[in-house]
Each structure stands twice: as C-alpha cells, then as structure tokens.
C-alpha cells in the first residue's frame, strides 16, 4: 500500500467504525483528496512517517482493547503492525511531530471502559509521540449518556456527522485550491449525483464454463479453519420464547483455547434471499452464474474477510460475502441513490420515479437522521427489503462489493473445556417481530439454527487474553444471566480459581435454566458455589428476581472475598441495565460490608479493580 499524505484509519469490531471511515473516504474523494483508507492493522507502520494528516475512527472491545483489525494484520499477525510498533518504548517523543491528527471514538457507556481504545491511541500518538491534534477528540456513546452526545438525544451518527464537518472544513481551509492540468483552480466537490467508481470492480472473466455444480472454496485467508458439526441441540423448552442452542463442532487439529476466548463463525445468506435479491435486479439474471474476476490495481486477497469465494460469480458473492439482510447504513444510500432510474417497473411511472429518487437522496444526504432511522432501524428493514421497496433502483452488478456491506464473522464465547478438540458454543437464536409485524431472524443465528450433524462450518478462534496474569489461585465471583454463562462454563472447567462463586439467572427454572444438571453436579461436588434466581418463576427463587438480588443476599461473603482475598469479579451477559445494576449493587455491598464510608469510596475501589484487571466485564 503506497504512502499518502492523508490517511483514514479505523478499528472496527461490528463494522460501524469501518462504515464511517468509508463514508469519510467517499466525501474526501468528492473533494479530490488522494488518501488511504484501511484498518489500523493493515496500515504500514513505515507509511505513518510520510503521512501528514491522519483521521482515526475506532471502537472499543473487550476490556478496553482495540478491535482485532486494529491490533492484527489481515493475515492475523501482530508483530510489525502499526499499533505494535507505536507501543515500543524506545520510540522518541518527537517521532510523530510532523503529523496532524483527529480522533473519533465509538463506544457504549454501559461499559466501564468507555472509549478506552480511542483514548489509548490518542494518548500514545499525541501525548507521547508528538503528533498535533487538529481538533479535540470526539467520543460517541451508543446509549447517549456520555461523551460528545451526552444527554442531547443525538445518536452516534450525528457525532460522526460533526466529525466529518470538522475534517472537511480543516482540509478545505488548508487546501482551497487543487492542480488540474498544471493549473491551480478552486477546489470544488464532484456533484453527488455522479457515482464515484471504486478502485476495484467486477467484470466477466471470459470463462463461460458452468459453475452451478462446482463446490465452493475460499482463497486468501489461511487462518480460517473448517469444523464439522457434532451437535446442534436446543437447550431451552420448546414452548419458551427464546431458542438457545448448544452447538458443538469438532476441529480438524484441535485448538489451544482458554477461558474468555471466542470463536468467529462465517455465516452466509440463504439461497432464497439471494434469488430474491437477483429478482429485484432483472438485468442480473443472465450474469448471475457467469464466472467473474475482480479488477484491482493491487491484490484482491484482502477484499473480503475470511477469503474470497471461488468460483467467483455474482450469485456466490451475494451468498457468501454481501450482507443483503443487514440494516442499511447511510453509506448504502449515498452510493446507490443515483441508480434510481427505472420507471418502467413502477405503477405510477416517471412521477413515482422522481419521488423515489428524492427519498433515496434524502436518506443519503440529510443531516437529520430521523427519517432513515424510522424507515430502516425502527422496523429493522433489510437492504433486500429496501431494494424491493424501491423498484426504480437499477444497480450495476460490477460494483456490488463497493455499495453492499460485506458479511462479517460473528463472535461467540467458548463454553467447553479448554483445549478440547470439540468446541462448544452457547448461542441465543435471534428471532423477533418488528413493528411491521414481520418475523426477523439474525443472519448468523438463522444460519446456525439450520446446521445439522455433519455440516461443515468455517471459523477462527480469537485469543482474547481475558484472564489477568497473576490473578489466578484466588476467588472468582462470576455474575452471568442468560447465555452470559458460556465463558463462565469454560472458566469453571479450567479450575483456575478457588473458590468459584457463580450467580446465574434466567426467566424460568423449568424452561431456560441452561446446563442445569451440569451446574448442579458441580455444586454438589463443591467445584462451585451456585446461586440462582428466576425472574418469572419467583417460587423457585423466593425474594430473588435478578442476579444483583442474589449478590445482595450474599453481600457479606462477596465483600469479604473482594476486600480480604482480592477476588476477581467477572460479569458477562446482555448490555444495558444488567451490568449497570450489578455495578451499583457491588458499590452498595462494598459500602455496607467492606468498610467503605460512602459511594465515592466504593466506586473508586471498583475503578481500581478495573485498572488492575480484577473487575472484568463482557457484554453485548
């Protein structure tokens, strides 16, 4: 990757930071700025010495860590990546004094280490290596309680919009002119109704051999492995609203995984959804199964996470790489509204065509995100449904890898015994009704629910280094409602802590008490101390509705283990109210039974526990 003086770097776990980086790149291209856009892990450490203007967009994962694609190269290597180089203690404090930089953090303040990743980057790049800040760091909060959008009702999209405005204002002030044919002319943006062709695109390969019966393989990512499904069993009652699966698959060579490590699964779309998408684009029918090739100035190896499908056809790309059932982000509308040109399929012809163009353009360009939120996010409307609604869209198949988002692997905590050849995951199947009264099923959990014994899955093990060094052989207090039990189960198998207290909660004892027999057996064998509560069957846990109630009932023992025996606290489960309520409860426990005089003192103690890796939280 050649060095440029402007670079946009992202660290993204779920794809949001990457999407914002791509939107910013799109805007810079409109203003004729040559630049690089890529993950932090992909960016050459050498190139930062030639870079003059750097824009960083990064989310936070795990215990305040940078996302994987910020820490590792696309090939899974850590050594030699930008972040690994920047962390070297031998670097001089003036290394980056040539660099001007701006930061945008994406976080969730229900996590204690809110936006830690962007703060780490900021502290190292600006505070310790001498880069100059263009404008103060912006931090977006997904729940709107902290950071740059604290209490103002604005979502992360509007924080990004402010970031984009400041970036463009700065660059356009710095470079009001550009060179065209050797002359200096005012810098004017390319009109938004002109599609900016991407660096890579598809074209027919000229090989007209049939592909329908050719089995698919994936090229370009040797770190992806194949597993064979051993068990895919529902472990909640059939009349319970939540379908939770115990998915077990065997690895080819065994895996050296440990408590807290995760597996990333590579799902794909159903054949029915792929065909439905092709049906919305009638001009694709004749090309859908024709062999294609990617035209790119560099290499196509890193274009799709997990390796590129072969045979490379439009149908296979839609099935394995394009996330057509995801909720569209603004970048989708920015790149596609100009293709609303087909009035022949509209009942009201050209009049309706103009209406559709106007609405799509509004989604693409309006700073008020309420309309796009109401149309896409509230009803969880998918890209497939959008193109079915807007039949005027005549999308060019050559650019689908540019305007359609790519399928990302989904991460699940390992719940089986460490270093076992058979890997067990505990997965809640996503299925719900929207305000449109339509059934929604998550892409990955839909894929998982259809797996049967003998099915082959593609996966990677992600090593998260969750367990704090030197913190073992001491008590651990595990707090985990629902499928948050998964990593706790792996931790109990490992027997690294003693004693082990498990506070587990769910709705009903007879419907969703996950792994009840196993947990009770461990409790009978004194491997764990088990405390359970069931929010919808109070007779089975009198006086205890939620996990924090069970913690409070055992407050004296919890406080003693934390303050006298330096216990580790591990909270895992759904984000939102649970981790907040658990933390508040622990503050009260410490204040009453840990001899802390007030809320401030107990909260400071919890913060010290976080900083020393004794308070661990993994929520989603």
UniProtKB/Swiss-Prot annotation:
Its cofactor is FAD; FMN. It is an enzyme of class 1 (oxidoreductase). Keywords: Cytoplasm, FAD, Flavoprotein, FMN, Mitochondrion, NADP, Oxidoreductase. It is found in: Cytoplasm; Mitochondrion. NADP(+) binds at residues 535-536. GO terms for biological process: cellular response to oxidative stress; iron-sulfur cluster assembly; nitric oxide biosynthetic process; positive regulation of nitric oxide biosynthetic process. InterPro entries: CysJ-like_FAD-binding, FAD-bd_FR_type, Flavdoxin-like, Flavodoxin/NO_synth, Flavoprot_Pyr_Nucl_cyt_Rdtase, Flavoprotein-like_sf, FNR_nucleotide-bd, NADPH_Cyt_P450_Rdtase_alpha. It comes from the Eukaryota. Pfam families: FAD_binding_1, Flavodoxin_1, NAD_binding_1. PANTHER family: NADPH-DEPENDENT DIFLAVIN OXIDOREDUCTASE 1, NITRIC OXIDE SYNTHASE-RELATED. NADPH-dependent reductase which is a central component of the cytosolic iron-sulfur (Fe-S) protein assembly (CIA) machinery. Transfers electrons from NADPH via its FAD and FMN prosthetic groups to the [2Fe-2S] cluster of DRE2, another key component of the CIA machinery. In turn, this reduced cluster provides electrons for assembly of cytosolic iron-sulfur cluster proteins. Positively controls H(2)O(2)-induced cell death. This is NADPH-dependent diflavin oxidoreductase 1. The lineage of its organism: Eukaryota, Fungi, Dikarya, Ascomycota, Saccharomycotina. The gene is TAH18.
């Amino acid at each position: 990757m050649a060095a440029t003086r402007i670079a946009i770097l992202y660290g993204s776990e779920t794809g949001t930071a990457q999407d914002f980086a791509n939107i910013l790149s799109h805007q810079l291209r409109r203003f004729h700025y040559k630049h690089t856009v890529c993950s932090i892990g992909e960016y050459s450490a050498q190139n930062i010495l030639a870079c003059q203007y750097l824009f960083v967009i990064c989310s936070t994962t795990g215990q305040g860590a940078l996302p994987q694609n910020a820490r590792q190269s696309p090939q899974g290597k850590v050594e030699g990546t930008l972040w690994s180089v920047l962390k070297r203690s031998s670097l001089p404090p003036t290394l980056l004094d040539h660099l001007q930089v701006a930061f945008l953090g994406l976080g969730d303040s229900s996590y204690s280490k809110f936006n830690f990743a962007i703060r780490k980057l900021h502290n190292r790049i600006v505070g310790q290596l001498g880069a100059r800040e263009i404008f103060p760091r912006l931090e977006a909060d997904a729940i709107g309680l902290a950071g740059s959008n604290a209490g103002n009702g604005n979502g992360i999209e509007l924080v990004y919009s402010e970031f984009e405005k400041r970036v463009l204002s700065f660059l356009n002030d710095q470079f009001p002119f550009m060179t065209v044919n050797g002359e200096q002319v005012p810098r004017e943006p390319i009109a938004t109704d002109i599609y900016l062709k991407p660096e890579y695109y598809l074209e027919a390969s000229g090989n007209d051999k049939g592909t329908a019966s050719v089995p698919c393989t994936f090229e370009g990512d040797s770190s992806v492995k194949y597993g064979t499904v051993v068990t895919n069993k529902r472990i909640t009652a059939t009349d319970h609203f939540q379908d939770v699966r115990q998915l077990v698959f065997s690895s080819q060579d065994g895996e050296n995984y440990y408590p807290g490590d995760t597996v990333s699964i590579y799902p794909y779309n159903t054949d029915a959804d792929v065909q439905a998408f092709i049906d919305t684009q009638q001009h694709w029918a004749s090309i859908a199964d024709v062999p294609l090739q990617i035209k790119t100035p560099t290499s196509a190896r890193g274009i799709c996470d997990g390796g590129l499908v072969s045979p490379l056809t439009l149908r296979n790309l839609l099935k394995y790489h394009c996330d057509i059932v995801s909720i569209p982000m603004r970048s989708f509308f920015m790149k596609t509204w100009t293709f609303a040109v087909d009035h022949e399929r509209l009942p009201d012809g050209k009049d309706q065509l103009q209406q559709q163009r106007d609405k799509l353009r509004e989604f693409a360009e309006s700073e008020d995100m309420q309309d796009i939120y109401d149309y896409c996010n509230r009803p969880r409307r998918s890209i497939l449904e959008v193109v079915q609604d807007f039949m005027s869209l005549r999308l060019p198949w050559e650019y689908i890898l540019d305007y359609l988002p790519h399928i990302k692997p989904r991460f699940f905590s390992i719940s089986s015994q460490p270093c076992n050849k058979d890997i067990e995951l505990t997965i809640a199947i996503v299925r719900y009704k929207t305000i449109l009264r339509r059934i929604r099923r998550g892409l990955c959990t839909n894929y998982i629910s259809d797996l049967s014994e003998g099915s082959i899955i593609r996966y990677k093990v992600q090593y998260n280094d969750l367990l704090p060094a030197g913190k073992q052989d001491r008590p651990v207090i595990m707090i985990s409602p629902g499928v948050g039990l998964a990593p706790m189960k792996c931790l109990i198998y490992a027997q690294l802590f003693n004693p082990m207290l498990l506070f587990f909660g769910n709705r009903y004892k007879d419907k969703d008490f996950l792994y009840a027999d196993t947990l009770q057996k461990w409790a009978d064998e004194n491997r764990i101390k088990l405390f359970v509560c069931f929010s919808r069957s109070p007779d089975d846990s009198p006086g205890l509705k939620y996990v924090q109630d069970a913690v409070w009932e055992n407050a004296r023992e919890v406080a003693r283990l934390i303050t006298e025996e330096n216990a580790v606290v591990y909270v895992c489960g759904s984000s939102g109210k649970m981790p907040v309520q658990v933390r508040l409860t622990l503050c009260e426990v410490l204040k009453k039974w840990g001899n802390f005089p007030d809320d401030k003192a107990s909260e400071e103690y919890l913060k010290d526990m976080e900083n020393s890796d004794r308070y661990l939280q993994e929520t989603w």
